[in-house]
């Protein structure tokens, strides 16, 4: 899916189902669209997301597919946009290091792991985003 499709679909679902239904978005990052699709879902009002530490996983029906959207990257993006997740990004990155140590052959992904958290980064203090 691309961001326009995601935004349109969630807006349609919300108009049909009403505001009493909580929806969760589930994106893979196989073609680099995970964070862009998350932003589109946020724009459509979605506040709950599936994600996976270090992007672990994949899809048995799609050879070469990556795992779910990288949790560390999603948390960083949400917090950088002013959305409070309640997740300690430093602790999350520490858990990722444990995964790297204990699963040396695992195919891991994620921009925050490669580039690090920018200097001066501070977690958001505004709206809450549900962490699943």
Enumerate the predicted regions with their spans.
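Catalytic cores and adjacent flexible loops of soluble metabolic enzymes
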Residues: 1-132
């Amino acid at each position: 899916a691309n961001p326009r499709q995601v935004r349109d679909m969630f807006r349609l679902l919300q108009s049909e189902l009403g505001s009493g239904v909580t929806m969760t978005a589930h994106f893979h990052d196989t073609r680099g669209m995970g964070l862009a699709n998350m932003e589109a879902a946020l724009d459509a009002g979605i506040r709950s997301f599936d994600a996976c530490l270090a992007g672990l996983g994949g899809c048995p029906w799609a050879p070469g597919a990556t795992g779910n959207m990288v949790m560390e990257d999603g948390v960083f993006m949400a917090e950088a946009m002013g959305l409070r997740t309640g997740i300690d990004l430093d602790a999350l990155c520490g858990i990722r290091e444990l995964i790297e140590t204990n699963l040396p052959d695992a195919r891991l992904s994620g921009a925050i792991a490669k580039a690090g958290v920018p200097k001066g980064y501070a977690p958001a203090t505004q709206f809450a985003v549900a962490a699943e």
